[in-house]
Amino acid sequence: MAILYALVARGTVVLSEFTATSTNASTIAKQILEKVPGDNDSNVSYSQDRYVFHVKRTDGLTVLCMAEETAGRRIPFAFLEDIHQRFVRTYGRAVHTALAYAMNEEFSRVLSQQIDYYSNDPNADRINRIKGEMNQVRGVMIENIDKVLDRGERLELLVDKTANMQGNTFRFRKQARRFRSNVWWRNCKLTVLLILLLLVIIYIAVAFLCHGPTLPSCI
């Protein structure tokens, strides 16, 4: 049997426990309860000879089990998570005010059943492995979604840049048309000035040949 002992406690107050072996597991477990930090949630393991005490503390409620060293960590902690959920679901807020062993008569049977299940039923490890794979897939999905969102942001940024480029192109064309118009008008003015200058030069030359500005010799 992989799991041999289990308890549920609030701080150092044991609310329910069950043992499947004649050892001093209960004594050691209560000593461990005094060492577990009282403020933070934690998952820890303590080695004792060929046994390991696994402890899960969540929201002030501590679930502990003693398992054979060969059981590893996955099955014991899956057991602790299962027990924690069952206990909270069954007793709710009563766990915060219950006296020592107040739930033992009823819940010790649940501990016994779940110890037997997680120790002997091959489906227990299979289900835990599937849960682990599902969590891994969920993590990959979240990662992929994050990447898609990141690509979406880059796409949105690219669209914004394209819109800016189009706006710049429109402004450039407008400025180019205005520049061409200004150049054309300058050319027209310059042409008119050149024609007028040429006419003045011709007039001066003719006036010189015709002996006066009124052109008396040529009229």
From Swiss-Prot:
- Tissue-wise expression: Expressed in flowers, leaves, stems and roots.
Q: Where is the Longin domain?
A: 7-111
Q: List the disulfide bonds.
A: none
Q: In its UniProt record, which GO terms are filed under biological process? A: membrane fusion; protein transport; response to abscisic acid; response to salt stress; stomatal movement; vesicle-mediated transport
A single GO cellular-component term from the record reads:
plasma membrane
Database matches in SUPFAM superfamilies: SNARE fusion complex (SSF58038), SNARE-like (SSF64356)
The regions listed as transmembrane in this protein's record are 190-210
> Where does the signal sequence lie?
none
Q: Where in the cell is it found?
A: Vacuole membrane; Prevacuolar compartment membrane
Report the residues modified as N-acetylalanine. Answer: A2
- SMART domains of this UniProt entry? Longin
Q: Looking at the keywords, is Protein transport present?
A: yes
Q: What does this protein do?
A: Involved in the targeting and/or fusion of transport vesicles to their target membrane.
Q: What does the comment on domains in this protein's record state?
A: The longin domain is essential for the vacuolar and subcellular targeting.
Its name, as the record gives it, is Vesicle-associated membrane protein 711
